């Protein structure tokens, strides 16, 4: 990582705002397709013995001498390790086993995917300064040559809230 001054920043990204006076540059940062990455990770996990349980609700977790018993809508599973990767539902699993209860307030963000004709405006991911809701808005090239701009950030109550808005 290194700090770029205005001149070097403008050399690297000529379309950057004239108001930009400096930037943090991460030369080893890259762009991936998140869908393909997740499929590849799941394939690798399956080849290494991971069992997937789809459409199976976790109802309770119990610690045992050998690891965990997971009580589900499809029966009991035993495992040595549990990884809480439940996203906005991570608080539900955490609260099943911890005395220190937490609550996750879901936050929804919307992106705008620009046409490929806009793809040459920037050559790398550019973040604005972070705000109170997160890392801030970014503009990034995609692996398919488009530009992605966003996200917005709105706190919501519904953990299943995936609708989009006209304002988006």
PLM ranges: what are they?
Residues 60, 76, 81, 86-168:
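Active-site substrate-recognition segment that forms the wall
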Residues 1-54, 60-66, 71:
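Flavin (FAD/FMN) cofactor-binding and adjacent substrate-gating region
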């Amino acid at each position: 990582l290194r700090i770029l001054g205005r001149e070097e920043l403008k050399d690297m990204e000529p379309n950057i705002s004239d108001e930009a006076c400096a930037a943090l540059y991460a030369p080893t940062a890259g762009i991936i397709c998140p869908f393909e990455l997740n499929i590849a990770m799941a394939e690798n996990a399956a080849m290494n013995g991971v069992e997937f349980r789809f459409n199976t609700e976790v109802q309770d977790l119990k610690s045992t001498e050998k690891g965990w018993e997971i009580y589900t809508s499809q029966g009991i599973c035993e495992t040595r390790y549990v990884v809480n990767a439940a996203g906005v539902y991570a608080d539900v699993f955490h609260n099943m086993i911890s005395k220190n209860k937490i609550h996750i307030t879901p936050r929804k963000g919307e992106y705008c995917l620009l046409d490929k004709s806009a793809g040459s405006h920037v050559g790398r991911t550019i973040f604005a300064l972070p705000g109170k809701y997160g890392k801030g808005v970014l503009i990034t090239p995609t692996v398919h040559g488009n530009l992605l701009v966003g996200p917005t950030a709105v706190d919501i109550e519904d953990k299943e809230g995936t609708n989009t808005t006209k304002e988006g």
